[in-house]
Amino acid sequence: MKSEDAEPRKEEKPTQKEETKALREWLVGQQQAIRTAGMPIIVLVEGWAAAGKGSLINELISEIDPRFYNVVSPVITPEADARYPFLYPYAKAIPENGKIMFYDSGWMEDTVRKYLRREITKEQYKARIRSVNEFERQLRDGGYLLLKLFLDIGRGEQRKRMNALRESFETEWRVSADDLWQQREYDAFKETYRGFMEKTGKAIPWHTLDGGDRKEAVHDALQLLVDLLQKAMEKGRYVGKPFQESFPLLHMKKLSEVDLSPALTDEEYKTELKKLQKKLGKLHNVIYRKKIPVILCYEGWDAAGKGGNIRRIAKPLDPRGFDVMPIASPEPHELNRQYLWRFWTRLPRSGHICIFDRTWYGRVMVERLEGFCAENDWKRAYNEINEFERQLTEWGAVVLKFWIHIDQETQLARFNDRQNTPEKQWKLTDEDWRNREKWPLYEAAVDEMLAKTSTKNAPWFIIESNDKKYARIRTLQIVIDALEKACEAH
């Protein structure tokens, strides 16, 4: 019989096991809501070798629909990927809207190991830190949810786990030479890991989990992921505000100030074209041998002559060493990712040339003027593009950007010529005529683009193209001059 004076029974707290089960059930139950909301989620799992990163990811995905997530291990970089920029394997793996991507180690592990092996210098290490902060911030500002976890274990525990793995023929392969090196250099890794997290944890924090207690690590990781998702579902998709970093910008003329009268005779054109193409062909062999990547970006008015200009650049090149990337309206799977993704995935390998016919600058022109992105998005893009191009030039790429320029009268004459010539009619679309009506708006957008994104290392060149022959020769001269300087510097 219960005494009236007895204290009321305290409600028992759920056990860790019960909490973990509830968190997992919530995550499973919200899959469709996350997909419908179009939330792209990245879970980066870093940590010590043998800390249980793979096991943790396996626990996190155990009840999730396999169509809803992917797991990648980009730290194991294939030789082919090693010929791309540092962030390439991570950027190309970002998920589509409404899906989760789990990275089994990533930009932290790759950077720390290369730094401690002295494969990158202190200055390169600093540049990587900056690039990581830019990359993470761009993802966040574009609506991505990013959870960064670090699994921590002590030196003794790591040694114990490695020894256990090495004792069995079935598991010894899981302990690599790099892992054993990390065990020997535990203190150096610990200090460098700490420094990396301090330098990259301000905008998007790191969360350290106790890898010594696997059940607790799973519980805490699920709790952090659920908290992140609940907050996002409550507040809606994050949209970053624009800001402008101080880049070394070059002074650019406004389009209205450009003299479009330069022209060449047929004889001058033929002589120069033959000489310059021969020189470019030889330079292509040198940049291939020296593994210098080259990125040529073409923008310009409709009918300005981009295609013909590109053909004169491409003709003397070895077809095995270059690509031309025509950029049209983004496909659905491209629209479902951060806008730079489709350009990250088209970058050339070192030693190769990539010619972009239209580029990432569509963000601040057609997408801006046609309302395909919000005002904050295109205003933020100037800085994001400068950061992207700085990462390319720090990788070693030669980046040249050409605005192929004509006046309105020349464009109208070329439009009429296309319309009246059957074999050219395919080049002219209704959209070309609509864009022509918006010439003043586009001109203002281009002037702003040139002023805000022509940097010392990735300059813009306005190519006078009322005379196509002159435009082709001038572009060839600029490309050859830049490649000669790059070859001399290597």
How would you describe each model-predicted region?
Residues M1-H490:
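Glycine-rich phosphate-binding loop of ATP-dependent small-molecule kinases
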